[in-house]
């Protein structure tokens, strides 16, 4: 028995030694790609700087309250402004408006422009948008946040198996997960690039709602 104990001790110590050695082993080659922030890059070429300035100016011409209009409406709050025309408020391919998707792209673009220019006006505007989205999410009361017209009902019908699809529509409504994806990506960019903590809070609430209220309730047939 004593011999077995000694053998077991030697094996254990050998394993610990190997783990330690593996943990301190250095890679044979260096990383071929080094990631860097947009804040570390500045455009000096006259032509490209002009294009960046035009983008910067255009982003600031868009009105947050118009981009937020459908979010407030779907949350039961009074919109502060009418939504933008065309895809944001008119019928698109028989699925109604593609409400809310522009705000997702807008948040992504604004967060990147902030890293590039450090313009405080952009940061102030993003803080306003995040605060408004947080109000909408709180009004729903369960983490849900979307501008899709009757979006929550679409998810409920899908869970019940009462739906038809005709890409990109579901129950004659623009597929809400697409729009949710754009909003979540925008919030992620705002959190990572601008360090606005409430953007992360909203994002986590949306993810929890989708996980618990949609994915957990779906079966293989759905």
Predicted regions and their residues:
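Bacterial Sec-dependent N-terminal signal peptides
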Residues: 1-25
């Amino acid at each position: 028995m004593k011999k077995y104990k000694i053998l077991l001790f030697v094996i254990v110590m050998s394993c610990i030694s190997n783990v330690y050695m593996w943990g301190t082993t250095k890679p044979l080659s260096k990383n071929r790609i080094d990631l860097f922030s947009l804040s570390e890059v500045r455009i000096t070429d006259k032509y490209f700087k002009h294009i960046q300035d035009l983008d910067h100016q255009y982003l600031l011409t868009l009105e947050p309250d118009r981009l937020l209009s459908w979010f407030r409406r779907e949350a039961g709050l009074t919109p502060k402004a009418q939504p933008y025309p065309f895809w944001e408020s008119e019928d698109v391919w028989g699925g109604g408006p593609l409400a809310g998707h522009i705000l997702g792209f807008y948040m992504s673009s604004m967060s990147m422009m902030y890293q590039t220019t450090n313009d405080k006006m952009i940061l102030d505007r993003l803080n306003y948008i995040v605060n408004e989205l947080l109000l909408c999410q709180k009004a729903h009361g369960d983490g849900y946040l979307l501008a899709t017209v009757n979006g929550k009902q679409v998810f409920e019908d899908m869970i019940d198996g009462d739906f038809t699809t005709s890409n990109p529509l579901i129950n004659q409504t623009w597929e809400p997960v697409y729009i949710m994806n754009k909003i979540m990506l925008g919030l992620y960019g705002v959190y990572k690039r601008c360090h606005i903590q409430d953007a992360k809070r909203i994002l986590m609430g949306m993810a929890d709602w989708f996980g618990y209220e949609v994915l957990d309730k779906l079966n293989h047939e759905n």
